[in-house]
């Protein structure tokens, strides 16, 4: 089974690692791809403190560190995984990649009510995905 695990820097996503590990150990053959979609960097005014290139490099560095954290958690459990870092619209990128997988795994939306109502991409992914979606918490 090929599983796309959409990761982010939220507690709910870190909690989803436990579910992913249990799932991996319950299946004979499983391949995980860890996907982090970083937002495109836009700078509207020149502050003189940091330029676009520096900001973009910082965001990429943070994203790579996040992927490494998740990779390490999987390796600790002897689960093979591949990491992919993309930038762009989260929904578009995830749905495009999901076409090549059997299952999409995402962490539950953050607990904060305002976040769930206005920022969460969870509902869009569930409604628009062509493959089954598991929301782990």
From Swiss-Prot:
InterPro entries: Rossmann-like_a/b/a_fold, UspA. It comes from the Bacteria. Gene3D superfamilies: HUPs (3.40.50.620). Belongs to the universal stress protein A family. This is Universal stress protein HP_0031. It comes from Helicobacter pylori (strain ATCC 700392 / 26695). The lineage of its organism: Bacteria, Pseudomonadati, Campylobacterota, Epsilonproteobacteria, Campylobacterales.
């Amino acid at each position: 089974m090929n599983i796309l695990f959409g990761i982010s820097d939220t507690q709910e996503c870190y909690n989803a690692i436990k579910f992913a590990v249990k799932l991996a150990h319950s299946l004979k053959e499983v391949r995980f791809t860890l996907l982090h979609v970083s937002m495109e960097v836009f700078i509207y005014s020149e502050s003189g403190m940091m330029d676009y290139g520096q900001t973009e490099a910082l965001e990429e560095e943070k994203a790579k560190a996040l992927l490494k954290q998740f990779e390490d958690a999987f390796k600790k459990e002897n689960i093979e995984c591949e990491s992919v870092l993309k930038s762009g619209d989260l929904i578009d990128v995830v749905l495009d990649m999901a076409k090549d997988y059997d299952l999409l795994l995402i962490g539950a939306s953050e607990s904060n009510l305002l976040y769930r109502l206005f920022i969460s991409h969870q509902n869009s992914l569930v409604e628009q995905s062509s493959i089954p979606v598991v929301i782990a918490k």
